């Protein structure tokens, strides 16, 4: 028998979803069988309702000791060096350097760095968390630098993830240095379609709709010569890089998209430098109208 005590990050989710997250390697058919055969007790009473909504301090007992519980597994990093731009009880915003992956099993990655930092602060304990895992709520490409938001608890994760889906509650802005002087309109809104090929690790952009292409929207505003302010409306993989390449203005040092070489560093001149919170729901409504800015180091040299 395995026992869990429901905490604040487990509550208000169904029994089935909780079990699926907690027993990650257990086949779903087995979890259904547990529920169907009443092999689960909640507060000492057998249940067979997969949609039962868990409440804080509920005691969940699973009568199958052969199925492993998979806790969050990550590479702990001692004395981690994070560039923290903003932090409160619910969220953490860090400045990701170039050439650092968001997530990796084998290499140093931002996820492991953030988790290690929160473990050191005693704000994250994998042995006390049943179904919640600290995670970023949006991503940046490996070669792109800039601001990344992490949710410290379940409710914050839900609110922020949904906010990015609605596209009007959080605004993200980038600085991009193009390989050549900007030769388009000072303000350009681009609506089109994009497809990322995992084999070539490149995205293809099209102004007309094609099969397997997803809609994307980007705004570009000229700042000075080849310095461009970019507002990302949709967040597709390599969206900014592929759109700029389509218009023959590839990002400086972005060899994959035919950008001009600036140096031998594993980086491109693209940085997510500003986040605006607009209309987040409670309990994150205190963030509304807050603007977080972290300019890239190279901006002062242009």
Swiss-Prot record:
Please report the stretch or stretches of sequence annotated as the S4 RNA-binding domain: 13-89
Q: What InterPro entries does the database record attribute to this sequence?
A: PsdUridine_synth_cat_dom_sf, PsdUridine_synth_RsuA/RluA, RluA_PseudoU_synthase, S4_RNA-bd, S4_RNA-bd_sf
Active site, renumbered: 141
Q: Which GO terms describe its molecular function?
A: RNA binding; rRNA pseudouridine synthase activity
List keywords of the entry alphabetically: Isomerase, RNA-binding
Q: What EC number(s) has UniProt assigned to this enzyme?
A: 5.4.99.-
Picking any one GO biological process from the record gives: enzyme-directed rRNA pseudouridine synthesis
Its UniProt entry gives the catalysed reaction(s) as: a uridine in RNA = a pseudouridine in RNA
- Classify the source by domain of life: Bacteria
The text of the family note is: Belongs to the pseudouridine synthase RluA family.
What is the name of this protein?
Answer: Uncharacterized RNA pseudouridine synthase MCAP_0714
């Amino acid at each position: 028998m395995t026992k869990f005590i429901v905490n604040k990050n487990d509550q208000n989710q169904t029994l089935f979803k909780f079990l699926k997250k907690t027993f990650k390697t257990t086949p779903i058919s087995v979890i259904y069988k547990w529920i169907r055969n009443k092999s689960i007790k909640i507060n000492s009473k057998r249940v067979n309702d997969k949609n039962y909504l868990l409440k804080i301090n509920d005691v969940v007992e699973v009568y199958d000791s052969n199925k492993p519980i998979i806790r969050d597994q990550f590479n702990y990093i001692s004395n981690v060096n994070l560039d923290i731009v903003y932090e409160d009880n619910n969220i953490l915003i860090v400045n990701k350097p170039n050439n650092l992956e968001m997530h990796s099993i084998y290499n140093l990655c931002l996820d492991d760095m953030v988790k290690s930092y929160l473990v050191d602060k005693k704000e994250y304990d994998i042995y006390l968390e049943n179904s919640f895992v600290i995670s970023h709520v949006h991503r940046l490409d490996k070669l792109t630098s800039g601001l990344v938001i992490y949710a410290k608890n379940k409710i914050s994760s839900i609110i922020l993830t949904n906010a990015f889906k609605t596209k009007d509650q959080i605004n993200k802005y980038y600085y991009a240095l193009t390989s050549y002087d900007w030769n388009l309109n000072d303000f350009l809104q681009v609506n089109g379609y994009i497809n990322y090929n995992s084999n070539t690790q490149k995205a293809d952009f099209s102004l007309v709709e094609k099969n397997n292409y997803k809609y994307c929207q980007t705004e570009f505003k000229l700042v000075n010569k080849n310095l461009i302010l970019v507002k990302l409306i949709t967040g597709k993989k390599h969206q900014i890089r592929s759109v700029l390449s389509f218009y023959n203005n590839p990002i400086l040092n972005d060899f994959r998209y035919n950008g001009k070489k600036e140096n031998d560093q594993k980086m491109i001149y693209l940085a997510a430098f500003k986040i605006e919170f607009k209309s987040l729901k409670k309990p994150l409504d205190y963030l509304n109208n807050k603007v977080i800015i972290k300019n890239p180091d190279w901006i002062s040299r242009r």
